[in-house]
Amino acid sequence: WISSLRAPQIAQLAAEHGPFQPSLFDERNLLELSSEHFPGERLVVCRNPLLASERARKREELLAATEVDLAKIAVACTRSRHPLRGEPAIALRVGRIVDRFHMAKHFELTITRTTFSYRRKVQAITAEAALDGLYVIRTSLPAARLDANAAVAAYKSLANVERAFRSMKTVDLHV
């Protein structure tokens, strides 16, 4: 069988083996390893530089957009006419912003009765950025039977199988 690891499992693997430096990957952007958490399985870490740059760009855009809106809330707390007051009112506005952009995990928020402040969690952002463009293929087949390149190709071909099943299930099926 061939499968892939989900993001939390990839983060756990990166913590176990140290950060995956770009120099560790060969010219095919593949790295084979094993883990005690997945006994008897081969793990192939793949790096997609285009996906990495896209995720980094998107994350930075979302962080910037979140900061712009959070700054507006901070200003609303300090304005002289009708200042925003009360922890519940401030928290409600802040919650709407961080929920909209899904960036709560990257900000440290401080809300009091009369003030609001925020700052980026640089360590969390750096940790997430280290995993940009990485995905891990997991297989039970030995290397003699299926090498790393073939495992990646087989995993990518699963998308075609999924597409075929999806089209089989559609209502537009005509016999």
Q: How should these model regions be labeled?
A:
Residues 1-175:
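Anion-binding and metal-coordination hotspots
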